[in-house]
Amino acid sequence: GPVMTRALTHLDNCYFIKSLKAIGYVCKTNTVSNTAFRGFGGPQGMLTIENILYSVSQYLQKPIDEIRKINYYSKLNGLKTPYGQIVKNLRIDRILDEVYKLSDYKNRLRNINKFNLNQKANNLPFRKGIALMPAKFGISFNKPSLNQGGALVHVYSDGSIRLNHGGTEMGQGLFIKVAQVVAECFKVPLEQIHITSTNTAEVPNTSATAASSGSDLNGMAAWNASNVIKNRMIDHAAKLFKKNKKDIVLGEGRIICGNRSLSFSELAFSCWENRISLSSTGYYKTPKISWDQGKLRGHPYFYFTWGAAISEALLDINTGESRILRADIVQDCGNSLNENIDIGQIEGGFIQGLGWLTCEELCFSKEGKL
């Protein structure tokens, strides 16, 4: 299944592994049916290799960060994943440099070691720990047919713009991001974009909004639709100004040609008067991806996102109670469409992962009852 496939393709995490064979088994159980939420198998795969590296560090009696360092993807070690994809956008070195600097890791590690020695010497129950967790996450569905998106854009004669696309808004900020893409294409204020709820009567055959692909698929589809309309409007503006369309510039809600200009709404009205279509569908499919599910080989991800977190925890060894004292996170978001939304997603992802690993557990009886 797709969850197991993502787990298997994330067993390498950030590390070059020359020889790896992994087989996943999906089993039916007597418990209530459930599925993955965030990460969709990725975190489980990453934790597997991290536990392996931890075992190696314990056996060799070396810090785990040293074991990690000599195994990261690099031009020296190798850039080919166990499933055959070449890692091109390598960001791990820069991210590690930034997260170590941001977290003041070395000084804090020394202070934590002193704290633990003092607690142990005085027979006190508290212990502190600090740890790094790097991550490489593949962006795309590992079923190629799902990597497609559609959009419908209308420009009205008063200059207002209506947008519909195949993505689902569930509080993650997708609608705002796609609206920003349209606003950027037309060079108009965001307030001019009116978003309507996702509806297969308007945009059919939608893919799931998942796999961190919603902004990519629907944003590009909306851009393509908007670009068709924009080019029609520019062609008309060139006729109005009696200039080459290369001389037409869009900016801040206006269409400019030398020392002459029109507002976007004025041009939209003129297009309508001259019977120029101001509506278009848009479609996008992720390029350069392929996957053989039977062989678990191919190029399933368009690109990878990289990140790292350094967390400090306090533990009561008598009660088992723990608390996160501080977390520093560095995440590669490329050219972020909306930094505030992305920061919220990063923080939310960390908190959800914290809950998953520390306090969330479904307990079942032998009969399978919750």
Q: Residues of each region from the PLM?
A:
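Gly/Pro-rich active-site capping loops and adjacent beta-alpha segments
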Residues: 1-45, 117-370
